[in-house]
Amino acid sequence: MKKIFALALIAPLLISCSSKKNAENAYNEAWIKDTNGFDILMGQFAHNIENIWGFNEVLIAGPKDYVKYTDQYQTRSHINFDEGTITVETIAGTEPAARLRRAIITTLLMGDDPGSIDLYSDVNDIQISREPFLYGQVVDNTGQPIRWEGRASKFADYLLQTHLKSRSNGLRIIYSVTINLVPNHLDKRAHKYIGMVRQASRKYGVDESLILAIMQTESSFNPYAVSHADALGLMQVVQHSAGKDVFRSQGKWGTPSRSYLFDPQSNIDTGTAYLAMLNNVYLGGITNPTSRRYAVITAYNGGAGSVLRVFSSDKDQAVNIINQLSPGDVYETLTNRHPSAESRRYLYKVNTAQKMYRRK
């Protein structure tokens, strides 16, 4: 009788554990399918571009590069947020000037809703906005910012008359126009998100300067940011890792959707929540706040586990070693001994950017 009673108590727990395990397995299977599906999509997308533009002319959107194809992949707009340039190109054999003109106008006047534009297709889904994303970041030949279609059209005509260039890919002629963004374009983009950053900073107790430094390093404040790893948005949040961790900590099931992470406020909230998790949970045992900040920055790029393994394969021992080192030694160790060159550079970039934002 006691055995039956004990089984009666344990059975619900076993069922609960089993259902959780089944749900986790189902989630992992879905993640694998999503990842494989994304890889297939990217491969087909690159193939479509290569067929028209040639192998050396394949250009795909990235964290700091907005690239949108239209006209059956024959026309593209590329905003390089690092270099501060807009390049509009066409390889079309018919009416290249008209195609360029249309692409220039729509690029200058597009809105700032990344969820409305599919960067992995040639669908012309760019909507002209009364509040263009690039407003204030680019000026016309008279030095005026561009908000309305009339001014954008006149500027496009001017560019085609005075700045049109051509080159050959070996088989076809590519026509292009390049526009420079204003010198302080980075600050102008950052200013758009200050209110959202301030709100997330207060909510999660993360320094505003760190959030801004992460955003600059990850995307150069490009809300359309994507990556080969399928990291999304301003803070380059990966749905199935950081996004999943944050949702779990907030009592939510699954992962944030692409549309959720392309929303600037949701992206900043999720990225900042993850920074707080790294600081308070995964790396919370590091006592010196500066040392912990260096660890958190590096972990945002390469994971908390890889940070700790730089010091020891045992997590507790790694924390003890870090706590015995000066912040300067922790910084030197992470920027010289972390196995990932990207993570080593990442700490330097974010730390440098954060110093700049602290002075503002």
From Swiss-Prot:
GO cellular component terms given for this protein: cell outer membrane
Lipid tethering residues (N-palmitoyl cysteine): 17
Lipid-linked residues (S-diacylglycerol cysteine): 17
UniProt xrefs under SUPFAM superfamilies: Lysozyme-like
Keyword terms, alphabetized: Cell outer membrane, Cell wall biogenesis/degradation, Lipoprotein, Lyase, Membrane, Palmitate, Signal
Reactions catalysed, as given in the entry: Exolytic cleavage of the (1->4)-beta-glycosidic linkage between N-acetylmuramic acid (MurNAc) and N-acetylglucosamine (GlcNAc) residues in peptidoglycan, from either the reducing or the non-reducing ends of the peptidoglycan chains, with concomitant formation of a 1,6-anhydrobond in the MurNAc residue
Keyword Lipoprotein in record: yes
First-listed, main subcellular location of the protein, grouped into a coarse class: membrane
EC number: 4.2.2.n1
GO BP terms, alphabetized: cell wall macromolecule catabolic process; cell wall organization; peptidoglycan metabolic process
Subcellular location: Cell outer membrane
Signal peptide location: 1-16
GO molecular function: hydrolase activity, acting on glycosyl bonds; peptidoglycan lytic transglycosylase activity
Keyword Transmembrane helix: no
Topology class, membrane: Lipid-anchor
Top EC group: lyase
Family the UniProt entry places it in: Belongs to the transglycosylase Slt family.
Classification via PANTHER family: MEMBRANE-BOUND LYTIC MUREIN TRANSGLYCOSYLASE C, SOLUBLE LYTIC MUREIN TRANSGLYCOSYLASE-RELATED
Role summary: Murein-degrading enzyme. May play a role in recycling of muropeptides during cell elongation and/or cell division.
Name of the featured protein: Membrane-bound lytic murein transglycosylase C
Organism: Cronobacter sakazakii (strain ATCC BAA-894) (Enterobacter sakazakii)
